[in-house]
Amino acid sequence: TAAQSAEAVSVEFPTVRVFVPGTQDAQITVGAVGETGTAAGNSYAQTVKAGNVAEIPLDHLKDGNFDVTVRSSVPVVAAVRTSVIGTKTRDFAWFVSSPPITDSQLVAVPPGPGPRLHFANAADKDVKVKIQPESGPPISLAVPAEGGTGAAVHSGRYTITGGDGLVAGVSFTGDGQTSAFAVSPAGPLASPIEVYPH
């Protein structure tokens, strides 16, 4: 069982939760970079003891979309929690890490409030991607080096091309509503799934 650190963080603030599964303490550095057109980010550093779970608050960030990078001296498990407060309700979402996507990636966006497709680029060169919906014109994006960007989308299926090495995710945001999921490439041993009609 993992021990919980004594530091409590308000659920209203964005937070990185980190678990150190090994036997060595982790030197953690967290970077938050605003997506294109949003506020600038910040960086944070903390030591997390082996076998512990700790929360690192992402304070001093303005409202907006951010790409969060966690660097550690030893292997860790990490995710980002954000929250929204609406007129009548509040909600929170976990943004989990994911492996880089491939050059041709299929994404299914379910119905939900304010869906948005996000891209993060850890490389030192800008990357141009094309997002092709099932019908209608494609969306072209330039993802800056060591930064990120995103685009508003609708529910449906999209094919992303040119995004090899990028990390992608989908978020939903409405009045007192939020959710998110990572876009993951197919596994090396994945096989087609046959779906039979009723």
Q: Where are the model-predicted features located?
A:
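Extracytoplasmic/luminal low-complexity segments enriched in Pro/Gly and acidic/polar residues
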Residues: 7-85, 116-118
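Short, surface-exposed beta-strand/strand-loop-strand elements in extracellular ectodomains
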Residues: 25-35, 124-137
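Short, aromatic- and glycine-rich surface loops/edge beta-strands on solvent-exposed regions
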Residues: 65-74, 155-172
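A cross-kingdom feature marking solvent-exposed beta-strand/loop segments within repeated
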Residues: 35-67, 88, 134-159, 179-181
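Ser/Thr- (and often Asn-) enriched beta-sheet segments in non-cytosolic proteins
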Residues: 17, 27-29, 45-47, 128-130, ...
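Conserved functional hotspot residues at active sites or interaction interfaces
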Residues: 1-22, 76-125, 132, 150-152, ...
